[in-house]
């Protein structure tokens, strides 16, 4: 069984690599072909969605690494969580942050439209520890490629209609859980117990 599982994991990883490469090839073909430039607008907008821990960040990183430096803008959907500073601290942990209502879709759509029109934006920042929006923002200039990445990046119809390419990333549930625990404990300062409880409750 262990040997079989080992080979299955290898095959899945190979398939994953091939899939990412195919996506990158499609992006390059669309963005830099004469047909694309005459058929679509100059800016290419990509939406990448998928469950937590599914590998969205890896796909995004591979895309950015494969395109010319300085040509990609990343808009993480997590940056557009609604501010929860008005909610008592003890109640914030009960908020389902994987529900569409947790995001400020209007602001995200507005920022994408501003970038399309050639304007810069001030991207909000969000703290996973306090579950609140931070006063600091990130100045973003329009680029050739805009990537919108998040668990529900393809959920909102208005935002989805702005996208030229839509990608959904999936992975085995057990593998996703391992990735989520590693990420949230190391990068977001949460305990393994808290991650497990949240994973079984809302993810």
Language model features: what each stretch is:
Residues 186-203:
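Small-molecule kinase domains that catalyze NTP-dependent phosphoryl transfer to phosphate-bearing small molecules
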Residues 70-85:
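Short beta-strand-centered segment that lines the nucleotide-binding/catalytic pocket of NTP-utilizing
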Residues 87-128:
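Conserved nucleotide-sensing/catalytic segment adjacent to the nucleotide-binding pocket
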Residues 135-186:
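ATP-dependent NMP and nucleoside kinases share a basic, alpha-helical "lid"
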Residues 56:
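Conserved lysine of the Walker
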Residues 59:
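Hydrophobic positions on the alpha1 helix immediately C-terminal to the Walker A/P-loop
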Residues 52:
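The conserved Walker
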């Amino acid at each position: 069984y262990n040997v079989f599982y080992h080979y299955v994991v290898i095959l899945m990883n190979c398939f994953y690599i091939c899939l990412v490469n195919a996506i990158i090839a499609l992006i390059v073909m669309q963005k830099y072909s004469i047909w694309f430039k005459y058929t679509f607008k100059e800016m290419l907008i990509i939406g990448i969605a998928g469950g937590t821990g599914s590998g969205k960040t890896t796909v995004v990183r591979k895309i950015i690494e494969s395109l010319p430096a300085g040509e990609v803008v990343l808009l993480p959907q997590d940056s557009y969580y609604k501010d929860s500073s008005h909610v008592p601290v003890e109640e914030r942990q009960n908020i389902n942050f994987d529900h569409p209502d947790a995001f400020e879709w209007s602001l995200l759509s507005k920022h994408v439209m501003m970038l399309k029109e050639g304007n810069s934006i001030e991207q909000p920042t969000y703290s996973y520890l306090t579950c609140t929006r931070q006063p600091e923002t990130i100045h973003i200039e329009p680029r050739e490629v805009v990537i919108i990445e998040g668990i529900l990046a393809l959920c909102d119809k208005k935002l989805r209609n702005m996208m030229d390419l839509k990608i959904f990333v999936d992975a085995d549930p057990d593998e996703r859980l391992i990735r989520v625990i590693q990420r949230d404990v190391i990068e977001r300062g949460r305990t393994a117990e808290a991650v497990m409880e949240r994973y079984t409750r809302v993810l």
